[in-house]
């Protein structure tokens, strides 16, 4: 059974690097990853996730009005969801992620 994981730490504690390494590990096993961050995080560009150690990946920017269940339905098959800076999602979006875990048996890893 899938779970929703919340990994947190202080600034500079390698949360983004861990998220990107996790993405890589899933993709190495042939799994499809939906990588996202809040749209408000534009420090490295709207659709780029970059760690302080230089790891980078394209991601989806999620605005506060985005219905994550609807976006999930629009995606091709997804095996895991990874969210960076999840503390900036709305409470409703966190509930939507929980619903995806429960209904779709989809692991969700949140970093913040």
Write out the residue ranges for each language-model feature:
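Structural recognition of the conserved hydrophobic beta-strand(s) that form the central parallel beta-sheet
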Residues: 106-112
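Conserved P-loop
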Residues: 1-73
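Helix C-cap/helix->beta junction micro-motif
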Residues: 29, 103-104
């Amino acid at each position: 059974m899938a779970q929703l994981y919340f990994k947190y730490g202080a600034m500079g504690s390698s949360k983004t690097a861990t998220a990107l390494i996790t993405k890589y590990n899933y993709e190495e096993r042939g799994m499809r990853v939906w990588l996202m961050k809040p749209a408000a995080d534009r420090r490295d560009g709207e659709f780029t996730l970059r760690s302080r150690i230089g790891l980078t990946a394209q991601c989806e920017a999620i605005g506060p009005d985005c219905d994550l269940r609807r976006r999930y339905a629009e995606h091709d098959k997804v095996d895991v969801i990874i969210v960076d800076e999840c503390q900036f999602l709305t409470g409703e979006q966190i509930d939507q992620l929980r619903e995806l875990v429960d209904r779709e048996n989809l692991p969700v890893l949140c970093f913040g």
